[in-house]
Structures are given as C-alpha cells and as structure tokens.
Design a protein with these regions (language model features):
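Periplasmic/extracellular loop-to-transmembrane helix junction in inner-membrane transport proteins
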Residues: 45-46, 70-116
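Generic hydrophobic transmembrane alpha-helix motif, especially the helices
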Residues: 141-177, 184-185
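C-terminal transmembrane helix and the adjacent membrane-cytosol boundary/short C-terminal tail
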Residues: 130, 187, 218, 222, ...
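Transmembrane alpha-helices
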Residues: 168, 172, 204-237, 270, ...
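Intrinsic disorder/low-complexity segments
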Residues: 1-47
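Short cytoplasmic-facing helical segments at TM-TM junctions of multi-pass membrane proteins
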Residues: 181, 185-226, 247, 251
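Glycine-rich helix-loop "coupling/hinge" segments at transmembrane-helix boundaries
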Residues: 156-157, 186, 233-270, 289-293
Length: 293
C-alpha cells in the first residue's frame, strides 16, 4: 500500500541494580531470571505457578467483562470481550489482520535489528576507544531523553510517508538504549581480567572478543530488552500518524470509524504480541546466560 491518505481503507470489517558477582555490570532491569540463586526455585513449574503468575491478567479480564456487562461504562467505550473476540475473528478471516500484522512486524524487525547491530558496535567502541567516546557520548546523552515520537514529523519530512521513515524512527529510538547498555557493560569489565589476558599474550582484539564482550553481554541483553519495548511503542505511534498499513493504522482507522470492538481487538493483539516477545526474549536470554549460573 502507499501512504497517500490516512483515512482510506481496504478493510473487510467496517461499522511496558543488582550487582552480579565478579563484574561491574548491572542485570537488575532484566529481573530475577538473570541472577543465580536457588536452583530448585528456578526449576519449579506447573499449572499452579502459571496461575499465580498470570492471575492479575485474568482478574483484569474479569473486571473488564463485569464492568462492560453491568453497563458501568458505555459498551462503545469498553465492548464486552465476546464482541471483541468476534471482531478479531472477522479481521483474521478477512486477512486484514495478517496483512497489516506482517507489515508492522517487518518494519519493527528491520529497525530493531539495525539498532542492535549498530548500537552494540558503537557502545563497545565507545568503551574501548577514548576518541570515539569523546565524540559519540555527548550525542547519545543529548538525544536519549528526547521523546522519540517527536521525531515522527522530522522523519516524514526527510524520508516521506513510506516504510523508510518508520524503520529509521524505530532504529534511532532503539539504538540509544542498546548503545548505552553496551557501553556500560564493556566499560564495567574488570581491568584485572584484561591485564591478565594481555599478559598471557592476547592481542587487544582477542581480549576484546574473549574478555570484554562476554563481560558486557548481560548488560547488553538488558538494553536490548528495553529496545524491544521501545520498538513496539514507536511502531504503533508512527503507524497511527503516517501509514496506510500496519497495526497502528488499523487502530486509528477503526477508531475513527467507530468500530470499537475491532479496534480493541487490534489493541489486544499488539499487547499479546509484545508480551509474547518479551517472554520469549527472556527465555532466550536465560539460555544464553546459563554459563553464569
């Protein structure tokens, strides 16, 4: 699709510091999965544990249904979950959900992938080379507090209404936390480890690869998790404003058309995808960092 007009549609349906021992990096933001501890507790599983873990979500869904059914709020403002589910099925059967979902996932994956690759390299280079740090660090610190959604008009002005503006926006927004986490992780490597490697004949490149990067990995993975959340936020925000496809476009168009049950269906789809991506990432990280336990 082209991005010429934000109010046309082809839809079939109308009407989100714990110090690890022996290192200077932080893994607090990744939660307890990053830390060692009681191995028996870490391995506990089963239905009771799952119910306890996700009970707040079940209670939220129950409260939603009760409030909607009792008429405490307008059904248009908060449709019953069965109507939301029916609208989701209609969107899925028509193919609109999958087509727009693929467009969103492609943009998000492209921007996040570039951010991880380039941000990691820049962060480690800042920690490893003082001249690079002197040049790059002020730029990163200056732009980090800026709300990245404020860059949407700038990206449209520079890159137009196509996918490029959205991908670059996600790239910029996600690269900053990745860069800072890679920098902090690499800079926190104990100097005695680097000196020991060098005294044993390791070159600077080998010391970087075999000492600094493994030491920086937990902090870097923490930053990537933050970037993953940023990617969802920036993706939907940009598609709400300047897109003719994607989840954000669907939410905006369905909301403007008063199809609130379908709008909530798309919102919940994005929420579930974000939650699943975060849980899947934590499982991957737990495997990657198994050597630390």
């Amino acid at each position: 699709m082209t991005d010429a007009s934000p109010h046309q549609s082809n839809f079939a349906v109308i009407p989100a510091k714990t110090e690890t021992q022996g290192s200077g990096f932080s893994a607090a933001s990744m939660g307890p999965r990053f830390r060692g501890g009681d191995g028996n507790k870490a391995k506990r599983s089963g239905l009771p544990t799952l119910l306890q873990r996700y009970a707040p979500l079940l209670l939220l869904a129950l409260a939603w249904e009760v409030v909607s059914r009792l008429g405490l709020v307008s059904p248009a403002a908060l449709p019953p979950l069965d109507k939301v589910g029916a609208a989701w099925l209609n969107l899925a059967e028509s193919g609109d959900l999958w087509t727009n979902g693929l467009a969103s996932i492609s943009r998000g994956a492209a921007g996040l992938g570039l951010a991880i690759a380039i941000g990691s390299a820049i962060g480690v280079a800042m920690a490893w080379h003082m001249p690079i740090r002197v040049v790059i660090n002020p730029i990163v610190q200056f732009f980090y507090p800026l709300p990245k959604s404020a860059l949407i008009p700038v990206m449209v002005l520079w890159l137009g209404f196509g996918d490029a503006s959205k991908i670059v926006l996600i790239f910029v927004g996600c690269m900053l936390p990745v860069t800072l986490s890679a920098f902090n992780g690499a800079r926190g490597t104990e100097q005695v480890l680097i000196w020991s490697a060098r005294s044993l004949g390791a070159s600077r490149a080998r010391a970087l690869w075999e000492v600094v990067l493994p030491s920086a990995l937990p902090e870097l993975l923490s930053g990537i998790r933050t970037a993953l959340a940023f990617a969802f936020v920036l993706l939907v925000a940009s598609e709400l404003i300047v897109a003719r496809s994607g989840f954000g476009y669907m939410i905006g168009w369905l909301g403007d058309g008063g199809v609130y049950d379908a709008m909530f269906a798309v919102v919940l789809t994005v929420a579930v995808l974000g939650f699943a991506a975060d849980r899947g990432y934590l499982m991957l990280v737990r495997r990657v960092l198994a050597w630390r336990e």
